[in-house]
Regions:
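Alpha-helical transmembrane segments and their helix-start/interface "positive-inside/aromatic belt" motifs
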Residues: 1-15, 47-48
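Perimembrane loop-to-helix junctions flanking transmembrane segments
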Residues: 33-46
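Membrane-water interface of transmembrane alpha-helices
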Residues: 59-73
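Membrane-helix interface motif
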Residues: 19-36
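Short juxtamembrane and helix-loop transition motifs at transmembrane-helix boundaries
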Residues: 46-49, 70-83
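Alpha-helical transmembrane segments and their membrane-interface exit regions
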Residues: 118-129
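Alpha-helical transmembrane segments
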Residues: 43-60
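Membrane-helix boundary connector in multi-pass membrane proteins
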Residues: 99-115
């Protein structure tokens, strides 16, 4: 693994930690005086921002770990397309988090729907491996 790749992996992991810190700060400061007699005026917007930040954090955190796992599995060699596969997996993980959060806000999240979303992400990755990563 080259120095540039190690630096990119570290930068992605640190940016994910930064986004998580931003998420925690926003969630703790968004509506500090939410009470039954005085509800938060921007509660829906705050929830959407929190879900977006969570999806971004998950996506940024999955990419370096997907790349590192491929590096270990393939015998400590990064083949062509490794970054593309890692980015695709990060996008799928972030989209799954965003979709589950959106379903939760809409009140449509149930256990079967959540299982379907996770299985759908797995099926998309399986089809992408067969279609794009075939030798």
């Amino acid at each position: 693994m080259s120095r540039r790749t190690r630096l990119a992996v570290a930068a992605l992991a640190l940016s994910a930690i930064l986004v998580v810190g931003l998420l925690v700060a926003f969630a703790s400061l968004a509506c500090p005086s939410d009470a039954p007699e005085q509800p938060c005026p921007g509660a829906v917007t705050n929830r959407i921002v929190v879900i977006g930040l969570a999806a971004l954090a998950v996506g940024l955190l999955v990419v370096p770990f997907a790349l590192l796992s491929e590096f270990v599995i393939r015998g400590r060699i990064l083949y062509r397309g490794a970054w593309g596969r890692a980015i695709r997996r990060g996008l799928l993980a972030g989209a799954s988090v965003a979709l589950l959060g959106g379903l939760r806000i809409g009140g449509a999240l149930t256990v079967p729907v959540a299982i379907f979303v996770v299985l759908l992400a797995g099926a998309i990755e399986w089809l992408a491996i067969r279609r794009f990563d075939a030798p």
